[in-house]
Amino acid sequence: MEKTQKMNKMGTEKISRLLLTMGVPMIISMVVQAVYNIVDSYFVSCMKDPNIPALGDYAVNALTLAFPVQMLMVAVGVGTGVGINSILSRSLGEGNKEKCSKISGNSIFLALCTCVVFVLFGIFGVDAYIASQTSDPIITSMAVSYLKICTYSSLGVSMYMIFEKLLQATGYTMQTTVAQIVGAVVNMILDPIMIFGWCGCPKLGIDGAAIATVIGQFISFFIDAYFYFRCNSKHFNTSLKYMKPEGRIIRQIYQVGIPAIIMQALMSILTYSINVIFVRVSTDAVTAYGIYYKIQQFVFFAAFGMNNAMIPIIAFNYGKQDKKRVNDSIKYGLIYTVSILCAGIIILQLFAKQILGIFSLTESTTELAMLAIRIITPGFIFVGANIAYQGIFQALGNGVHSLILSLVRLIVVPLPLAYIFSCFDFASSIIWIAFPIGEAVAFIVALVFMANIRRKKINPIKNSV
């Protein structure tokens, strides 16, 4: 009975409550993920050396340059996970346990392949990548060292994200939250110890930040793996014999997964391109953008958490052909996600100065980061809707629509505008406007896509089962 109730809650529980019970743990999980990205920045901003003025700013700059590759690692894991989540949830709704086992086993195989790719990039590509963004020897040295440690140890991040999605698809969101929190706490504890050489540990500087991050990721991986074999085995066979690659399953995963990977990777492309564009303005602008971006992630990742809860619920009920529950999931998913972003607008507008005061930055960098927050955050209301629509499209198998939406909001509109604005003498004051304009245009595109998908996929569904 317990097993049946667990399997059916996505098809029976009231949607408004179900989204919260599944979404809140995922929101916590995603916010904890944002902690990984900001804790390192905080501690390295406190690094000091009498021979290197503003060493903290140099270190934050180095992390900003390395960050797009870290985002790409996450993009591949999350994008693959979205494909897994979508087809696994639909297969659960259809009651196809054998297919669920194959999806899960092939997912683990794909995570191992991802790790190999990033290790090879760490060996052969990191130096050239960093050199394409800066010629400063101090920043280059720190960025290369940090990024090589992260790529060589990419097994942790690749595996924990796949196991996380496998658990989320079956409704075990609290377990993934536990794994995220424990990993983040370990990271936060180890960061100052390794960076500054506390408790008898050698003073490792920025390398210590990388090592602490990697250890935290491996801890999350081990916990998620434990819960996966313990919990998901109640619903389908979790034997590793299903790791044998099966082309049909992998194709189905990546029909949704590849657009999602590209969609997530666009954030890496955006950040890398913005770094290159902002160098034309000033080094302070690059550092300010890096700090703003990581602060912004606390709000965006909370919305992604709700999005992650919405995707399996919509997919499950679409698999069951339950029209009412699909529509309710879309409605409440939009309401909750936009509400999260509206709360983010209020918090960042009211407390920008206090939040930026956490970091040991120069006055000029702090002023630029403050300006970025003031200008960009009003556009968050469009961000909330766009994130929700991306999840809706993915859940219904329209990954290409999500990809196009991401292209518009992250590349097609903001990058050309940012480049144009960077050509003006007062570039540092106006370049930030490119981001909310991109979100507003993408919102219009999303409305058009949603109307088309509703007509073709949702409206033809017969009355609720």
What are these regions (language model features)?
Residues 193, 387, 412-422:
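Transmembrane alpha-helical segments of integral membrane proteins
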Residues 136, 172-173, 282, 362, ...:
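Short loop-to-helix capping motifs
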Residues 1-23, 88-155, 201-258, 314-379, ...:
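Short alpha-helical transmembrane segments in multi-pass integral membrane proteins
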Residues 27-82, 86, 150-157, 217, ...:
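Transmembrane helix-bundle signature of multi-pass secondary active exporters and lipid flippases
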Residues 35-38, 46-47, 57, 91-94, ...:
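Helix-loop interface residues and adjacent transmembrane-helix termini in multi-pass membrane transporters
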